[in-house]
Amino acid sequence: MLNTCTTFGLIAMKNTFTLDHADVKAIAVAAEAEALRHNWAVTIAIVDEGGHLLGLQRLDGAAPSTAYMAPAKAHTAAMGRRDSKVFEDMINGGRMSFLSAPVLQGMLEGGVAIMKDGQCLGAVGVSGVKSTEDAQIARAGIAAIGL
């Protein structure tokens, strides 16, 4: 499932993990199942550690705008190496300067970083229902790969 790459340096060896196609499919299937279980019409986006889109599915009935918001939330979580809710909370707490961050456009809850051993492998972004429910769907997808 998770691909491992070993990097050799002069002193240390570091393992890095990446999402493979099977991981992306497993995340998508589990996230979709969670959404369908609650009859939630959402879009689910999965990105790699650089925020590049690996998978997108817009479920029946999901608003067209969700196909833009879900990848933006995932991108924000991957690039920030933390859930997008952290940025939303900072802004709501008065740190308005984050609104001008150049590459972070999805600073709303619903983007969940995929972390393994302190390394960000990517993120899942969901849009279409309440933001807490978006995050619930994303976490259900990530749980499918044991993280």
Where are these regions (language model features)?
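Flexible, solvent-exposed loop/hinge segments and secondary-structure transition points
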Residues: 10-147
